[in-house]
């Protein structure tokens, strides 16, 4: 069972029928799985190659250099370098299911988070230019590429759901999204609790745009058989994996699914306990709405006025509710 793959050129350059079909298939797959893969995006292959190069270079820096951009011990500002184990996503595993998390899964991952360059509420944290020349400028430029791609996908979803084209975009007037580089250090299989490098969780925002290497291990929960996970493998490092975040699930009253996902031992191989898993690298852009917009369900998706989400929280309040748990 494989997650569907779409060709972005059908949306970007195709005729009216190709455009319509892309939007329809995008929404149908996100309704069924919450995940989809998109090839031939607006992000050039050469940029992705350089992105992974910077990813490896940054995490290979000595710890005292990465400490210059250290994420605080507190949840905010959610910026900078987090050491292995500093964040614990397993604490929010059952958040959107209204379930209490019953198992702590240690995280074997370090990360680097950044937001928009002009975000005054949560300013970015950077290492010095001499520590990794060109890193900051490149990452800021890549962030803008993701912002533009995210914007186009929101238009496509509005079309696929027969909503006004700018309905979703109107809730993204200020740039509050985040970009994260991940590094999963090599580790012996016997040291992984439940075979996981990070525990299951869902994402906070509207859409996540993920690039990953070929190491494998990403799994998504089957929305028709909760508790069962299937692998999400990339055919190439240039393929963008797109998944629905909690805010988009809430707006659509669960029409589009924010599926739990995790990083597990790759399937299809019997690992010995002393076998060492290779380093794993990925980069995720978390598209997020304006901080002051409500994340209640849209009336268009509430048959008979029934809504699963009517707690009148805005996006920042919702984001903080989950973030405070992960960095508790």
Curated annotation (Swiss-Prot):
Metabolic or biological pathway, per its Swiss-Prot or TrEMBL entry: Mycotoxin biosynthesis
Keyword Cytoplasm in annotation: no
Residues that coordinate or bind 2-oxoglutarate: 280
Enzyme Commission code: 1.14.-.-
Residue span(s) of domain Fe2OG dioxygenase: 175-289
GO BP terms, alphabetized: small molecule biosynthetic process
Cofactor annotation comment: Binds 1 Fe(2+) ion per subunit.
Binding site for Fe cation: 201, 203, 261
Necessary cofactors: Fe(2+)
Practical and industrial applications: Pneumocandin B0 is the starting molecule for the first semisynthetic echinocandin antifungal drug, caspofungin acetate. Pneumocandin B0 is a minor fermentation product, and its industrial production was achieved by a combination of extensive mutation and medium optimization. Inactivation of three of gloP/GLP450-1, gloO/GLP450-2, and gloM/GLOXY1 generates 13 different pneumocandin analogs that lack one, two, three, or four hydroxyl groups on 4R,5R-dihydroxy-ornithine and 3S,4S-dihydroxy-homotyrosine of the parent hexapeptide.
Record key words, sorted: Dioxygenase, Iron, Metal-binding, Oxidoreductase
Gene Ontology MF term list: dioxygenase activity; metal ion binding
Signal peptide: none
Top-rank taxon: Eukaryota
Pfam families in the record: 2OG-FeII_Oxy, DIOX_N
Function (record text): 2-oxoglutarate-dependent dioxygenase; part of the gene cluster that mediates the biosynthesis of pneumocandins, lipohexapeptides of the echinocandin family that prevent fungal cell wall formation by non-competitive inhibition of beta-1,3-glucan synthase. The 10,12-dimethylmyristoyl side chain is synthesized by the reducing polyketide synthase gloL/GLPKS4. The thioesterase gloN/GLHYD exclusively interacts with gloL/GLPKS4 to maintain turnover of the polyketide side chain.
Family the UniProt entry places it in: Belongs to the iron/ascorbate-dependent oxidoreductase family.
Protein known as: 2-oxoglutarate-dependent dioxygenase gloF
Organism for this UniProt entry: Glarea lozoyensis (strain ATCC 20868 / MF5171)
